[in-house]
Amino acid sequence: MDSAVSDPHNGSAEAGTPANGTTRPPSTPEGIALAYGSLLLMALLPIFFGALRSVRCARGKSSSDMPETITSRDAARFPIIASCTLLGLYLFFKIFSQEYINLLLSMYFFVLGILALSHTISPFMNKFFPANFPNRQYQLLFTQGSGENKEEIINYEFDTKDLVCLGLSSVVGVWYLLRKHWIANNLFGLAFSLNGVELLHLNNVSTGCILLGGLFIYDIFWVFGTNVMVTVAKSFEAPIKLVFPQDLLEKGLEADNFAMLGLGDIVIPGIFIALLLRFDISLKKNTHTYFYTSFAAYIFGLGLTIFIMHIFKHAQPALLYLVPACIGFPVLVALAKGEVAEMFSYEESNPKDPAAETESKEESTEASASKRLEKKEK
């Protein structure tokens, strides 16, 4: 998981000279401000809209939009899995030809990017279809076993409008595959980020603290302790990061001096912020205090990351600044409002988990039974 804010060319004092030995003109202050301002804005969009869509996703019953719930066990294992993946990629790039690895990764992310972008633009595109558009419903269903032992492996519902969105997304996919243009990269990166915030749900605040705390250590080690993360980020030709040129004002769309932000720095804090929005809604106070607090904390943390990176001219582990801000600010607000207990007792169940469904049914049965008893006593 790429989770660092850096400038691949200007990440250090020596980086003004590219690998071919030619001198790269230094970026102008205006170009730097435009690049990092754009990265900040691009990071906020999937968090904000992904959080809003996560609420509808949690309430929805569509099998194609079921969220994936992260438990405390998943959160504890995630930094280990991410470290193994990162180290594996680093070794692959050292041992095998970078050209062939990136070719395979490009094909893989070409397919994933089309699906993610199609899912992202579908709600917006629905507004442009005429009322008499011939929209047909489809279902892709794969099962294993038969009778009572039948188990659904894939159950995806879609319609003709989704197929149109898939076609439009394929155009972006071909553009990315052929040109590797930074705009196509960012379209896929934004789609991945929004889908991650929307569909990955933490089951409670404690799990979020475990996940962010573990990745806090992960980020510091792999950025400051080794050059592994920065090396992989530079070698990895896939839309796992948002990029924006610092020389856009001089070279236009053909600019090539990029600042970058890993998608991990968007999705990981984003799913925690989305959880706090759902917690806000569960309080039924018609306020989104914790969501706005954590959202402002993210802006502060990422802004501080960019500032520190610019001062020290070195890639920064963004989660070093984002994690304390995104956890600390909402907890301080909860302390001030006396809602710490409510915050840490808020729980979301996995809609795919039969045990959770059974427990929910039992709770509703018990609740209705207690109501009947109360009526009889009256």
UniProtKB/Swiss-Prot annotation:
Upper classification of the source organism reads: Eukaryota, Metazoa, Chordata, Craniata, Vertebrata
Glycan attachment points: 10, 20
What is the E.C. number? 3.4.23.-
Pfam families (UniProt xref): Peptidase_A22B (PF04258)
User: Per the similarity annotation, which family is this?
Assistant: Belongs to the peptidase A22B family.
Q: Which SMART domains match?
A: PSN (SM00730)
Q: Which organism's genome codes for this protein?
A: Mus musculus (Mouse)
Query: What is the name of the protein in this document?
Result: Signal peptide peptidase
Q: What class of enzyme is it?
A: hydrolase
